[in-house]
Design a protein with these regions (language model features):
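Peripheral (non-transmembrane) domains and long loops of multi-pass membrane proteins
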Residues: 1-9, 66, 71-74, 192-301
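Alpha-helical transmembrane cores and adjacent cytosolic helix/loop segments
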Residues: 1-214, 300
Length: 301
């Protein structure tokens, strides 16, 4: 799975280079703020794709002495950095757009067939990139790749806004270009807000919604578990870490308790195959412990 993640991230980086160069050349030739904004956006995409590639390579490294829980946080940090780049892009676009909207001498960009072709090409590339990234992200649980996929889905919408701006300029509406640039910025900010929340939640070890309750139900269904004291879950990149404290009959042999904790771990992994599960067993108090009669009727060995 890690090889697939690296492969799709590397492909995304290569296409980011192609799009950045193409948009920059056409933007300078036509003088379109919309295309130049897209060129800057693609340049930041290039940086983000590089960060993502580095992150998925690092996150695949096994746990070591200094990182006993693995390197999955590289992916969460990558998503956070990409979000900051999206915000910077939006701020620059909004500033340049308002400058042109306030300039009465602004005559609009030079329109040409090249402007329409390069943005159409960008939409085609971003559509294929986002689909590939989203597919691998779903299969591997990679937040970094998912962030990249959402990023490029927003690029499709923003590129469509640029096409509208170029079309307006061709029809004698010069203000259409900076207005389209504002649309680009707003779309990017909208996506950035969602990404920054999710990446910060992961970096701060916020429990994934509903997962702790589901794990608790699975553990409670295991024969031999008398009580579930606590369930703590967190994510580290694509990995889920679960810590479970259960109460067992303290009058049973240690081998029996070990067997129960093994089945608790198996029950959690049935729903979350890639989870790293830690189970701690505590004995029930004497008043809570099952009677000898209950133990004799227990089907467990």
């Amino acid at each position: 799975l890690s090889d697939r993640k690296v492969q799709v991230a590397g492909s995304s980086l290569l296409w980011a280079v192609v799009l950045t160069a193409t948009k920059l050349i056409v933007g300078l030739f036509t003088g379109s703020l919309g295309i130049l904004a897209e060129a800057l956006h693609s340049a930041l995409d290039l940086l983000a794709a590089g960060v993502t590639l580095y992150a998925v390579r690092q996150s695949a490294r096994p746990a070591d002495r200094d990182h006993p829980f693995g390197h999955g946080k590289f992916e969460n940090f990558s998503a956070f950095v990409e979000t900051l780049l999206l915000v910077l892009t939006s701020v620059w676009i909004l500033w340049e757009a308002q400058e042109r909207l306030r300039d009465p001498a602004f005559a609009g960009p030079r329109t040409s067939v090249w402007g329409f072709l390069v943005i159409g090409f960008a939409i085609w590339v971003d559509w294929h990139r986002s689909r590939a990234l989203a597919r691998v992200a779903r299969e591997t649980g990679s937040q970094a790749l998912e962030a990249d996929a959402l990023h490029f889905q927003s690029d499709i919408l923003s590129s469509a806004a640029v096409l509208l701006g170029l079309g307006g300029a061709a029809l004698g509406l010069p203000q259409a270009d900076p207005i389209a640039a504002v649309v680009v910025a707003l779309v990017v900010l909208h996506v950035a807000w969602g990404l920054i929340r999710r990446s910060v939640h992961a970096l701060l070890d916020r429990a994934p919604e509903g997962v702790a309750d589901d794990v608790r139900k699975r553990v409670q269904a295991v024969t031999g578990v008398e009580e579930v004291d606590s369930v703590r879950v967190r994510t580290s990149g694509p990995d889920l870490h679960a810590e479970v404290v259960v109460r067992l009959d303290g009058g049973r042999p240690l081998t029996w308790a070990h067997d129960v904790t093994d089945r608790v771990e198996a029950a959690v992994k049935e729903g979350y195959p890639e989870a790293r599960v830690t189970v701690h067993a505590e004995p029930l108090s004497p008043a809570e412990a099952p009677s000898e009669e209950d133990r004799e009727t227990d089907s467990l060995p």
